[in-house]
């Protein structure tokens, strides 16, 4: 997985730069998400791995499957990926592109897991506090996990803040085993 991310990074960056320069981050994000979904269909994977087809034929077939979702520059991007045998990287390219897009827009998706349902007022306070701390516009999603026992587990990008009772007990158990 890390290898795929490393290979996908320059393509995601190139797509991001093209989208930013065209002021079309949303359109590119949608197109890449569609292409990533199409690339994960088993029959499509079979066609893309067929040794008898040229890169041009694979790209043309892939673009045809995506239909009207891809603009001309996005179709050209698919052809570049096919020429370099990188169509299988589309899911990683899409994820990385969305990370670049979120960074550009100064937004961040945050997931908060709690042992109990949190009310709207608490959710609003949490969004305000996280927005201020992270200097980003925060989009919050919540989940209930009774195994946490209490407290909260916050995931913001690659940052994890474990303020749960389960996390504290795990740290205590680890300290006692030392």
Curated annotation (Swiss-Prot):
Location of the protein in the cell: Cell inner membrane
Instruction: Please name the InterPro entries in this protein's record.
Output: ATP_synth_OSCP/delta_N_sf (IPR026015), ATPase_OSCP/d_CS (IPR020781), ATPase_OSCP/dsu (IPR000711)
Q: How does it sit in the membrane?
A: Peripheral membrane protein
Per the record, the domain of life is Bacteria
Q: Which GO terms describe its molecular function?
A: proton-transporting ATP synthase activity, rotational mechanism
**Is Secreted given among the entry's keywords?**
no
- Pfam families the record matches: OSCP
Keyword list (alphabetical) reads: ATP synthesis, Cell inner membrane, Cell membrane, CF(1), Hydrogen ion transport, Ion transport, Membrane, Transport
GO cellular component labels: plasma membrane; proton-transporting ATP synthase complex
What family does the database annotate?
A: Belongs to the ATPase delta chain family.
Do you know which NCBIfam families this protein is assigned to? ATP_synt_delta (TIGR01145), PRK05758.2-2 (NF004402)
Q: How does it assemble?
A: F-type ATPases have 2 components, F(1) - the catalytic core - and F(0) - the membrane proton channel. F(1) has five subunits: alpha(3), beta(3), gamma(1), delta(1), epsilon(1). F(0) has three main subunits: a(1), b(2) and c(10-14). The alpha and beta chains form an alternating ring which encloses part of the gamma chain. F(1) is attached to F(0) by a central stalk formed by the gamma and epsilon chains, while a peripheral stalk is formed by the delta and b chains.
Q: What is the stated purpose of this protein?
A: F(1)F(0) ATP synthase produces ATP from ADP in the presence of a proton or sodium gradient. F-type ATPases consist of two structural domains, F(1) containing the extramembraneous catalytic core and F(0) containing the membrane proton channel, linked together by a central stalk and a peripheral stalk. During catalysis, ATP synthesis in the catalytic domain of F(1) is coupled via a rotary mechanism of the central stalk subunits to proton translocation. This protein is part of the stalk that links CF(0) to CF(1). It either transmits conformational changes from CF(0) to CF(1) or is implicated in proton conduction.
This protein is called what?
A: ATP synthase subunit delta
Q: What is the native source organism of this protein?
A: Saccharophagus degradans (strain 2-40 / ATCC 43961 / DSM 17024)
